[in-house]
């Protein structure tokens, strides 16, 4: 009817006007563009559609747990992957090399969400091994009467499976890159020259080959920072970890556009930061690189 159409039109106009004013979407195009750029620079992403809380506040609340998982996974991946790749290069074409190489290829190809579900199935199920909790970052029984060490132990107990699920693929990939890089360097002339001068093979390997082999490994770090959000989506969703990954998934599902856009913007910024850090580390590991000289 006419009354219903008028009511519906009035409702949508009122709602649109309210949204435009609350989220500063009203005005000429150039003002909208400049305002948006300024809000991005100042990290003012507006308020969440879900609870009207400032977006940056909710991101800061979720950031520590995502940082914790990713930093632990980062150090574990390099701590395991680099020595393992070096060992496989030294033991090339042996039974150990072939078995471990096959295993790392399999780990590298497994999707994280599938591995996460398998971990929950086998290690959080009374029918198999009920060793770890399936979700969360702490037990429901935690209260003020618990000591610091009890809370820390409980938290570590909850973090074991998420860290494993986010580390296995990284260390497998790093070990493969490290093995290839070491084998390439072992064929270089400087290795034969050093051995001809009487240096022991272990000295040549650890002092010269390893450092040069780390150069391509360093460039992989450019993908680690943006992976803090993208790579955490599956892990945090499967294990119900209240971090940025789960927040990203929930924001997309409920169409919380300010939150989703803020997380995508931060992900893009982390990509650029990762590339910058990789370039700096590349200069440290490769003394041949000199940014002060310009190519003519």
Please state what every model-predicted region is.
Residues 6-7, 16-27, 131-149:
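Compositionally biased, charge-rich terminal segments
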């Amino acid at each position: 009817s006419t009354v219903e159409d008028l009511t519906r039109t009035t409702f949508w106009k009122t709602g649109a006007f309210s949204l435009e004013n609350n989220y500063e979407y009203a005005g000429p195009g150039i003002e909208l563009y400049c305002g948006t750029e300024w809000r991005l620079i100042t990290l003012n992403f507006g308020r969440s559609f879900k609870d009207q809380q400032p977006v940056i506040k909710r991101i800061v609340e979720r950031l520590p747990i995502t940082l914790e998982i990713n930093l632990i996974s980062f150090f574990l991946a390099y701590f395991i992957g680099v020595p393992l790749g070096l060992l496989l290069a030294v033991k090339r074409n042996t039974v150990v090399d072939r078995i471990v190489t096959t295993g790392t290829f399999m780990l590298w190809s497994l999707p994280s969400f599938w591995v996460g579900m398998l971990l929950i199935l086998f290690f959080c199920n009374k029918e198999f091994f009920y060793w770890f909790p399936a979700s969360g970052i702490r037990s429901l029984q935690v209260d003020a009467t618990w000591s610091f060490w009890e809370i820390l132990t409980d938290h570590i107990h909850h973090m074991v499976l998420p860290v494993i699920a986010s580390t296995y693929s990284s260390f497998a990939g790093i070990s493969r890159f490290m093995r290839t890089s070491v084998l390439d360097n072992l064929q270089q002339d400087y290795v034969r020259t050093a051995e001809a001068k009487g240096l022991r093979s272990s000295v040549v390997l650890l002092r010269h080959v390893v450092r040069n082999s780390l150069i391509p490994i360093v460039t992989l770090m450019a993908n680690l920072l943006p992976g803090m959000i993208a790579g955490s989506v599956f892990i945090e969703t499967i294990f119900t970890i209240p971090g940025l990954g789960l927040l990203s998934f929930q924001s997309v599902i409920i169409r919380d556009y300010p939150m989703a856009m803020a997380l995508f913007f931060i992900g893009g910024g982390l990509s650029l930061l990762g590339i910058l850090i990789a370039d700096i580390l590349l200069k440290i590991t490769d003394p041949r690189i000199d940014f002060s000289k310009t190519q003519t």
